Every structure is written in structure tokens, then in C-alpha cells.
């Protein structure tokens, strides 16, 4: 199980863990809300290949949980961001595989935790685990493609937050049949999504080196537009970080990205958000777009002031 509004890294790493369970002859499923996921094209690829029976709605898994059930959480460590709080509360044994910076509100009772903040993605960590498994029962090309998509998402196609281990994982996945061209297709969007993304980028303004864009509620199924627009805003000269806020169900969803000059996780943590240095998000409840904008700007002010103080102290 991954986080709410699961992305390609959450789903890709979950698919990798599912393969490990199968290698060990342990029955397992992936709990995922297919209506809210940002990895819809990946799910469709598995469904079209006849491999979709392992993706189960969270509510449907509750009746099969026993005292011996092991919950493996990927791509998040925060309890409030889990795909299903009910599954977490019902499972007595929990394993966490994550690469995000540890903060308040993390899962505090794991049986085992594999936490590496310097890894590019949860998919990279799962790749390393898979390489210890028997080669004769290893992953399929489709599973390798899912893991490669997770790495490509969190590294922005190997542009940021990559290390030697990242490229080693990608090379191993390529040797297992992952096709980069097919993987790239998972990032394609519809014409409507592209237009919504362009509208958000057009509405942005620059505040203290940060691009801020606000949007009223998007059509159903367009959640993927937020992180894409945030990434697009980083290509503007002089922009160190981007924040895209979109109204949703009486609240506001925020997607933030940076090139490394600002730590967007630190900026969004006071708003209840999480993530890591260059990629973070937050969900504000009972909040208007204007309130969200004010709170984002306040946190940018605080962060920039702290940066200035550190620079003065270093002189």
C-alpha cells in the first residue's frame, strides 16, 4: 500500500514488492484507490495485459486481514497520508520502505523499516531488494517498466536527485526488459489535461524566487495536472521552486517542486505536508485558495529569512 493519490513511484514500488511476495510464495495484493490514483496509465497497462487482479480497493481488503497479515507501506512514512487508515490500524505488523525525510507524524510502530533519504525513489530501493532474489523467478518486463517509471518520475527523467545506485537500478531494470520508450508513454496526458496544465502555468506569478499558481477545482481525473504544472514552472528563469494550489472538495491540494535551492518539504511541513527536498505536497482541509496562498507565502517568507540569516552568519 502506498499513499493517497498514489503516483508512479508508489504504484511501481508496490508492484515490485508484490513480485517479491510471489517469489516467496506468499499471497499478496496491492491496496489502491484506482479512482484517485495519478498512475492511471500504468494501471491500465496491467489491466490490458491481464495482470490487474492484484489491484484491490482498500475497503475490499479489510475482511481478509488477520493477526498474521503483514502490511508493507511504500513511498510514505506518514500515517495521515496512507491510502487507507483502516488497513493500517487493523494490521499488527507493518514494514515501511521509503525515501522521504523523516518528520512528525511518521509510522511509529514498524516491524521493519527500510528508510534511505538519499535514494531517488521508493522504486530504486525496491530494485535493490529484488536483486537479492533468485534470478530464475525474477520480475517480468512489465513489472520492470513500472519500477523504471517510478524512478523516472521522482528524478524527472534522471535530471535531479540521482546517484550511482539510481543508474545501477535503471540498468538492472533495462536488463530485465524495461523499455524506455514504452515507459515514457506512461507520462503522456490527454489534450484536456494539457490545456488545464497550460492554464495553470499561465496564471502563475513569481514571489521571492518562487512560482505560485492557483486554480479553481479541476475536472474529475485531472489530479495528475498539479505535479506536471509544478514541474513546468521550474523551467522559468529565476524560479527556484514552484507551488501549485488547486481547490478540491472544500479544501486545497498543493504540489511543490524545486531544483534544490529551496527545501519544499520544510516549507510545506508546517501546513501538514510532506515529501523531500525537491518534491513535496500538502492537503489543506476547510481552506480557501486565498487562505492557502497566504499560508504558502508566509512559509516562503520564513524560509527565505532563515536562509538570509544563515548566509549572514557564514560571512
Regions flagged by a language model, labelled:
Residues 12-13, 41-44, 84-86, 106-109, ...:
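Short acidic, glycine/serine/threonine-rich loops at helix termini
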Residues 55-109:
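Active-site cofactor/cluster-binding pocket
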Residues 3-4, 74-77, 97-100, 129, ...:
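Fold-independent oxyanion-binding glycine-rich loops
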Residues 51-60, 113-117:
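Short acidic-hydrophobic, aromatic-tinged amphipathic segments that line or gate anion-handling sites
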Residues 1-5, 10-52, 62-69, 148, ...:
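Hydrophobic helix-and-loop "lid/oligomerization" segment in the mid-to-C-terminal part
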Residues 17-18, 88-91, 112-113, 169:
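Glycine-rich, phosphate-binding/catalytic loops in enzymes
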Residues 92, 124-141, 245-259, 304-306:
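A short, flexible low-complexity segment enriched in Lys/Arg and Gly/Pro that occurs
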Residues 99-170:
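Short alpha-helices
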